[in-house]
Amino acid sequence: MPKIKTKKAAAKRFKKTGSGKVKHFHAFHSHLLGHKTSKRKRRLRKSAIVSKGDMKIIKKILPY
């Protein structure tokens, strides 16, 4: 049986942490920022952990 291929689009967007969790960056922070508050833009700068509900899908598309 062949190895499962990694989805390269997902590999660019998600990183696995040492403890096995998956980290991602927030959307909505590349352009059209004039009407967004400073607080909102500051929060969007930081990375976040993928929720438990999405982990099943992420593990399937990022097997290694």
From Swiss-Prot:
PROSITE patterns: RIBOSOMAL_L35. SUPFAM superfamilies: L35p-like. One of its GO terms (molecular function) is structural constituent of ribosome. InterPro entries: Ribosomal_bL35, Ribosomal_bL35-like, Ribosomal_bL35_CS, Ribosomal_bL35_sf. Pfam families: Ribosomal_L35p. GO terms for biological process: translation. Coiled coil: none annotated. Keywords: Ribonucleoprotein, Ribosomal protein. One of its GO terms (cellular component) is cytosolic large ribosomal subunit. Signal peptide: none annotated. It comes from the Bacteria. Belongs to the bacterial ribosomal protein bL35 family. This is Large ribosomal subunit protein bL35. It comes from Carboxydothermus hydrogenoformans (strain ATCC BAA-161 / DSM 6008 / Z-2901). The gene is rpmI.
